[in-house]
């Protein structure tokens, strides 16, 4: 269970980093938002899911 928790936290940190970098690139380009809207929404949905997964795993471990 510890390994699953650590992997979930790593995935959350990696997804957060990618979204921070990707967000700046999307809004900096002229047509970035209209072309990459689905990617941003998918990444945000993944991030929210990982937050809940980390919370559930944390409650099981402690």
Swiss-Prot record:
GO terms for cellular component: chloroplast thylakoid membrane; photosystem II reaction center. Its main location: plastid. Keywords: Chloroplast, Membrane, Photosynthesis, Photosystem II, Plastid, Reaction center, Thylakoid, Transmembrane, Transmembrane helix. The chain crosses the membrane at residues 8-28, 41-61. It comes from the Eukaryota. The keyword Repeat does not apply. InterPro entries: PSII_PsbZ (IPR002644), PSII_PsbZ_sf (IPR036512). GO terms for biological process: photosynthesis; photosystem II stabilization. It is found in: Plastid, Chloroplast thylakoid membrane. Pfam families: Ycf9 (PF01737). Belongs to the PsbZ family. PSII is composed of 1 copy each of membrane proteins PsbA, PsbB, PsbC, PsbD, PsbE, PsbF, PsbH, PsbI, PsbJ, PsbK, PsbL, PsbM, PsbT, PsbY, PsbZ, Psb30/Ycf12, at least 3 peripheral proteins of the oxygen-evolving complex and a large number of cofactors. It forms dimeric complexes. May control the interaction of photosystem II (PSII) cores with the light-harvesting antenna, regulates electron flow through the 2 photosystem reaction centers. PSII is a light-driven water plastoquinone oxidoreductase, using light energy to abstract electrons from H(2)O, generating a proton gradient subsequently used for ATP formation. This is Photosystem II reaction center protein Z. It comes from Zea mays. The gene is psbZ.
């Amino acid at each position: 269970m510890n390994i699953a928790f650590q992997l979930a936290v790593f995935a959350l940190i990696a997804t957060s980093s990618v979204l921070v970098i990707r967000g700046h690139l999307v809004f900096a380009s002229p047509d970035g938002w209209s072309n990459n809207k689905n990617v941003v929404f998918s990444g945000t949905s993944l991030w929210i899911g990982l937050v809940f997964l980390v919370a559930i795993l944390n409650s099981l471990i402690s």
